[in-house]
């Protein structure tokens, strides 16, 4: 079964809730472990354009937000459900989500 690395960027205030949403949907599972993720903090920048309904910031003004990058692994079976759960729970109108398929590395 294929595994994926998923990365989502979320405001720091929403990071704990997002990690729980990810786990509840089946992400962050590695062998006999759950809730497996890695996080780093940084500054997200964006400019809402006309027609946007930003949760944070104003249309036509560049906004900077302290965000947390949450990365975790996800099985192919759980991937679509995890992505749907992230989109539903994410505070942003257009959440930044990256997905990579991982190489199958045999265990010795």
Where are these regions (language model features)?
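Hydrophobic structural segments
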Residues: 1-108
